[in-house]
Regions:
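A short amphipathic helical element positioned immediately N-terminal to and/or at the very start
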Residues: 1-11, 111
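An intracellular "coupling" helix at the cytosolic face of ABC transporter transmembrane type-1 domains
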Residues: 11-12, 100-101, 117-126, 130, ...
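Hydrophobic alpha-helical transmembrane bundles that constitute the permease/transmembrane domains
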Residues: 22-33, 59-70, 122-125, 129-141, ...
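Helix-loop junctions and hydrophobic alpha-helical segments within the transmembrane domains
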Residues: 91, 95, 204, 305, ...
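ABC-type nucleotide-binding domain
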Residues: 318, 324-570
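Transmembrane helix-loop-helix hairpins at lipid-water interfaces of multipass membrane proteins
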Residues: 14-71, 75, 148-153, 264-268
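Helix-loop-helix
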Residues: 44-49, 53, 146-160, 230, ...
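Transmembrane helices of ABC transporter permease
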Residues: 9, 13-24, 58-61, 128-182, ...
Length: 570
């Protein structure tokens, strides 16, 4: 993938920019010859009429060039903004499609830096690249031709110095490329650390961790500063050499030009035109020199964009569309093995059949693999062995979107967006009406507290629902599932953040909702799963016991020990 493919949707804009650049550069190349004619022919003849005509014509060309340049910049900058938008959207969509294994090893702040800062740098050169390429080609080529046309000897002296400067710039560009890439890397680390610390600001303050957090942030900014200083040294060297070569060229023109004029090999009008063409010739070089920093920074950002866009999701989309209205909810785990990308084995030859409408609970100690079962059913990860079927079909055959339409989940770790209550509930079904949202909230026992909010369902709840209590956030999460109304439910510690009275109310609602739906409940508090049709006890990724609450208590096995330990604590 290269940057040029993003120009394709904007071919007309690109063509306009190139055509405008051709016109303006072409006109600029003719200006010095008109001045040469005025100074060398019109002025000595004292022809006032010709002077006025040619002066007016030159002014008209200047104004025309101004108008075209304005239009080119407007169209070109608009194109640049749109390409930047396309790049950012394509990267964000790609990130959305990546699986959890990718996000387990990547820092959120680092990814945010790539979506925002890196793409922003790329957008800066979208217009400059094609525009300057055309302008420089025409201006430098035309100027070089006329320099030799006016005086070949002086042109050779001057262009030798220009060639030396160009070689020096090429050498320096190679050095700056690696320096800018390193700087972008450090900027990503700074963004990642800042995001992580600010997201956990309550924990930082609660444990008096401000100094430690500051030291951590200070360390990464120090690394960034070192990288930036290396870049600045290259920039300083480039600025110094530009000044030196400019002065050397001016000195050459003065000395050699004076000698030529003394020997009647050059006129004053020739020297003035030569200087004007030299300025035209050097201006693109100066522009390219100043653009070098921006280009290297932009390319460093684009390469980081490419690194992400080339990451292939390990969880591949299927082709079969599951109709949530027709799915019964028969779920089968057949000889399932699962290990996380770091090699940690969680499930080993795991077999479980859940009939449509059955309520099954998964219990066991921390790390037994309970939540991993839910993640596999949702295809947050794919099994490393065996298969999982929904209504007899391997879930890997379903499209991810349709599979997720069939499964509703309420997790212990709730995420609410910085939006209104209604929009947070509507995540369960985006096409739902306000009446549907309120009905779902009532089912989740959330309507009462929502009605007491300043603006009711239109109330803003802050980032991650910071303005709500833990129980209120959990009830909004439940309301999403009530609104979605899927054939399969996953309740992962769904009532963990609720007080006893609220938990009792919600459990009644869940019992009603689960009556005709396949329900997989993951619980640490065993009192919440006593009425499940079947309780599965996990230990080290394997099923060690299975049965109803009464059967397992009579067996006096691991479930009995877990239950009694919790009962004795209470």
């Amino acid at each position: 993938m290269d940057l040029f493919q993003f120009y394709k949707p904007y071919k007309k804009s690109l063509a306009f920019v190139i055509a405008g650049a051709l016109l303006t550069a072409g006109m600029e190349v003719t200006f010095p010859m008109i001045v040469r004619h005025i100074l060398g022919v019109v002025l000595p003849a004292r022809d006032m009429q010709s002077l006025l005509y040619e002066g007016a014509g030159l002014l008209g060309l200047y104004l025309l060039c101004l108008g075209i340049t304005y239009c080119v910049y407007c169209v070109g900058r608009t194109m640049g903004v749109r390409v930047e938008r396309d790049l950012r959207n394509s990267l964000f969509r790609h990130l959305e499609n990546l699986d959890f294994a990718f996000f387990d090893k990547e820092k959120t702040g680092h990814l945010v830096s790539r979506v925002t800062g890196d793409i922003g740098e790329v957008g800066n050169i979208i217009f400059e690249m094609p525009h300057l390429a055309v302008v420089c080609l025409i201006t430098m080529g035309g100027s070089a031709f006329f320099l030799f046309y006016i005086n070949p000897l002086l042109a050779v002296f001057v262009l030798m110095l220009v060639a030396l400067k160009t070689g020096d710039t090429i050498f320096l560009n190679r050095k700056m490329k690696s320096a800018f890439a390193e700087t972008r890397q450090h900027m990503g680390v700074v963004g990642s650390v800042a995001t992580e610390i600010l997201a956990a600001v309550r924990a930082v303050k609660a444990f008096n961790g401000e100094n430690r957090a500051y030291q951590r942030f200070s360390d990464v900014t120090a690394d960034l500063a070192k990288s930036q200083m290396r870049t600045f040294r290259y920039q300083a060297y480039m600025a110094g050499t530009v000044t030196f070569f400019s002065n050397a060229i001016n000195l050459t023109i003065i000395v050699v030009g004076a000698v030529l004029m003394m020997n009647d090999l050059m006129t004053m009008s020739d020297l003035v035109a030569f200087l004007m063409y030299l300025m035209l010739f050097l201006r693109p070089i100066m522009q390219l020199t100043s653009l070098t920093e921006q280009y290297q920074r932009s390319m460093a950002g684009f390469h980081r964009y490419q690194e992400l866009i080339r990451v292939e999701p390990k969880v591949r989309d299927g082709s079969v569309v599951a109709d949530s209205r027709r799915i019964k909810g028969d779920v089968v785990f057949e000889h399932v093995d699962f290990a996380y990308p770091d090699g940690t084995h969680v499930l080993k030859d795991f077999n479980l059949t859940i009939k449509a409408g059955e309520q099954v609970a998964l219990v066991g100690p921390t790390g037994a693999g309970k939540s991993s079962v839910a993640s596999l059913l949702l295809r947050f990860y794919d099994v490393t062995g065996g298969k999982i079927t929904l209504d007899g079909r391997d879930i890997r055959e379903y499209t991810l979107e349709s599979l997720h339409e069939c499964i509703g989940i309420v997790q212990q770790d709730i995420y609410l967006f910085s939006d209104s209550v209604s929009e947070n509930i509507r995540l369960g079904r985006t096409d739902s009406s306000q009446a549907d949202i309120e009905a779902a909230a009532k089912d989740a026992r959330a309507h009462e507290f929502i009605s007491r909010l300043p603006r009711g369902y239109d109330s803003y709840i802050g980032e991650r629902g910071v303005m709500l209590s833990g129980g209120q956030k959990q009830r909004l999460s439940l309301a999403r599932v009530f609104l979605k109304n899927p054939p399969v439910l996953i309740l992962d510690e769904a009532t963990a953040a609720m007080d006893n009275e609220t938990e009792k109310q919600v459990l009644q609602s869940l019992a009603e909702l689960s009556r005709k739906r396949t329900t997989l409940t993951i619980a640490h508090r065993l009192a919440t799963v006593r009425h499940a049709d079947r309780i599965i006890v996990l230990s080290d990724g394997c099923i060690c016991e299975s049965g109803s609450h009464e059967e397992l208590m009579k067996a006096r096995g691991e479930y009995y020990d877990l239950y009694m330990s919790q009962f004795n604590k209470t």
